[in-house]
């Protein structure tokens, strides 16, 4: 297969050909109990074990025919030029508010001593105060902030590559993320598409950029087919960002003709739409039953392009299967309940990402092995399930879909 563009994602289930991952690194060893909440973790993964599990995830994708790229390697290659690297450091330090803690100049000087690979590892891992040469403290803020160990916070959530940017069609969104702990993450993708040889010559459309004032995250963005995108209105994604993205998609000659804005409960357990709802085949979906009302009802806003790109028709609907059938042109859909629909099992397995499947072809998904009830439910419906070990990976509260950013999928025949 000849790829004429580096980004091509017109479905959730097309055969996966290129995907971007981030191998967990030293950033996880900069987690401590005191700062877990600040850095959006509930526990501290054991690094050698989580790396082994992640390597098995990557190997599984390769065995299924996918090219695996790594965020850290792409970023380093994009920053090969010294001037671009210095520009990146300036932008990163500004966003990290390094000027507030008085360390901007020292951090910049420190980071410029590294080659691109080492510098990228350093900023992803975080910079502890004791890593810089000690100087006599003379400013009040220096004396008072000694208890906090970092000049630059680590980025332990980076192995969830789904969220900072998301491919839609031939372009992508580079997202303004909600939480300060993750906001710097999308800067890497901006530099990759602007400066990496694989991407920079292709004029890749950016449907929504990270400087937009409202939040959106990739875990809420699902490409259902070449004309339809579902986006979660969630704890992390705002209605305002969705509306702007819809207008940009309609006005900029994308193939997208409709967007389903799916409201889900705003809680950490249901962080993104893909933690409670994913597509596994042309007409089959996993769903966590707790996002629906007693009668299976929920709020779904269908935004459709009118006769002109500026004209948007919005309707509110409440029956997810009916909306999916109509918008995807299906005679029927099958919703497969996480945990088999059992109240306890579904809550337990959803917490460990039982609904967060990664489709690598129609009817073929990668899942966590610990969600054995959900996996069996998928198999009973004819889905091929490829399980990966998850004892440490799942501590980060994200599953196979969260840990992957598809860049190229073959079209669904």
Swiss-Prot record:
One GO-annotated biological process of the protein: arginine catabolic process to ornithine
Catalysed reaction equations from the record: L-arginine + H2O = L-citrulline + NH4(+)
Main location class: cytoplasm
GO MF term list: arginine deiminase activity
Gene Ontology cellular component terms for the protein in this record: cytoplasm
One Pfam family hit: ADI
Annotated metabolic or biological route of this protein: Amino-acid degradation; L-arginine degradation via ADI pathway; carbamoyl phosphate from L-arginine: step 1/2
Main EC class the enzyme belongs to: hydrolase
InterPro entries the record matches: Arg_deiminase (IPR003876)
Location(s) in or outside the cell: Cytoplasm
EC number: 3.5.3.6
Keywords linked to the UniProt accession: Arginine metabolism, Cytoplasm, Hydrolase
Keyword Metal-binding (UniProt): no
Active site per database record: 402
PANTHER family given in the database record: ARGININE DEIMINASE (PTHR47271:SF2)
HAMAP family: Arg_deiminase
Similarity comment: Belongs to the arginine deiminase family.
Name of this chain's protein: Arginine deiminase
Species classification: Bacteria, Bacillati, Bacillota, Bacilli, Bacillales
């Amino acid at each position: 297969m000849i790829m004429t563009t580096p980004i091509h994602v017109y479905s959730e289930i097309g055969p996966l050909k290129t995907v971007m991952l981030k191998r967990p690194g030293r950033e996880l060893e900069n987690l401590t109990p005191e700062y877990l909440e600040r850095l959006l973790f509930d526990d501290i993964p054991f690094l050698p074990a989580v790396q082994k599990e992640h390597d098995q995830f990557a190997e599984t994708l390769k065995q299924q025919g996918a090219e695996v790229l790594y965020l850290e390697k792409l970023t380093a290659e994009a920053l090969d030029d010294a001037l671009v690297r210095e520009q990146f450091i300036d932008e990163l330090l500004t966003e990290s508010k390094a000027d507030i803690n008085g360390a901007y100049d020292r951090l910049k000087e420190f980071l410029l001593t590294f080659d691109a690979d080492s510098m990228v590892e350093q900023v992803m891992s975080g910079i502890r105060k004791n890593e810089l040469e000690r100087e006599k403290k003379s400013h009040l803020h220096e004396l008072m902030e000694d208890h906090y160990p970092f000049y630059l916070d680590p980025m332990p959530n980076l192995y969830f590559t789904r969220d900072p940017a998301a491919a839609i069609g031939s372009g992508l969104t580079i997202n303004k993320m909600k939480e300060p702990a993750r906001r710097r993450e999308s800067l890497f993708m901006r530099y990759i598409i602007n400066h990496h040889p694989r991407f920079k010559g292709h004029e890749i459309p950016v449907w929504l950029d990270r400087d937009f004032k409202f939040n959106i995250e990739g875990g809420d963005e699902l490409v259902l087919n070449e004309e339809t995108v579902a986006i979660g209105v969630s704890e992390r994604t705002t209605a305002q960002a969705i509306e702007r993205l819809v207008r940009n998609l309609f006005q900029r000659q994308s193939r997208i003709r409709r967007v389903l804005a799916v409201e889900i409960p705003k809680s950490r357990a249901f962080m993104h739409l893909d933690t409670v709802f994913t597509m596994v085949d042309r007409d089959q979906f996993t769903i966590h039953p707790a996002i629906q009302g007693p009668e299976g009802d929920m709020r779904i806003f269908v935004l459709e392009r009118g006769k002109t790109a500026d004209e948007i028709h919005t309707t509110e609907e409440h029956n997810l299967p009916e909306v999916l059938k109509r918008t995807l042109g299906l005679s029927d859909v099958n919703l497969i309940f996480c945990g088999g629909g059992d109240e306890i099992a579904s809550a337990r397995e959803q917490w460990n990402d039982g609904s967060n499947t990664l489709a690598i072809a129609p009817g073929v998904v990668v899942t966590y092995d610990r969600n054995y009830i959900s996996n069996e439910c998928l198999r009973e419906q004819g889905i091929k399930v490829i399980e990966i070990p998850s004892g440490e990976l799942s501590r980060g509260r994200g599953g196979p879909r969260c840990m992957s950013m598809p860049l190229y999928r073959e079209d669904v025949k």
